[in-house]
Amino acid sequence: MMLDWNAYPVELSARVKEMSRLAPNAVAGFIALDKGANKTVHLDAKTRELIAIAIAVTTRCDGCIGVHTDRAINAGATREEVAEALGVAIALNAGAALAYSARVLDAYAAIDGAAKAPAE
């Protein structure tokens, strides 16, 4: 089901406010981290937001997708630039799956080898 991306930020904001009441230090820490990360010196706002969108996709964060897509649009990112950033995210996720596949083969060899090793 597709989200209503115009209504979702309002709903999310209500949950964040609730979380802020329940765990104020955690939310304050997040806000400080977010503000610090947004004060880039070498990256312009558009580039930073395109990176954030790609990361939002790889971490499967709907709230991040909504916030950073809005920020990217406001920073002047085109639909084509967003699509290219998403292409990078897709490739990275595929690459991560390939790299972690090697870990499974390692684990299989270790576990299977241990099961077949003669008892001492």
Set out the residue ranges of the language-model regions.
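C-terminal structural segments of small proteins and small subunits
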Residues: 83-109
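Acidic, glycine/proline-rich low-complexity segments that act as flexible tails and inter-domain linkers
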Residues: 1-47, 100-120
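Charge-rich, acidic-biased intrinsically disordered regions
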Residues: 76-86, 112-120
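Immediate flanking context of iron-sulfur cluster ligation sites
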Residues: 42-59, 80-86
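Short cysteine clusters
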Residues: 61-64
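Amphipathic alpha-helical segments within well-ordered protein domains
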Residues: 34-35, 52, 69-73, 87
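Iron-sulfur (Fe-S) cluster-binding segments and ferredoxin-like electron-carrier domains
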Residues: 67-82, 105-108
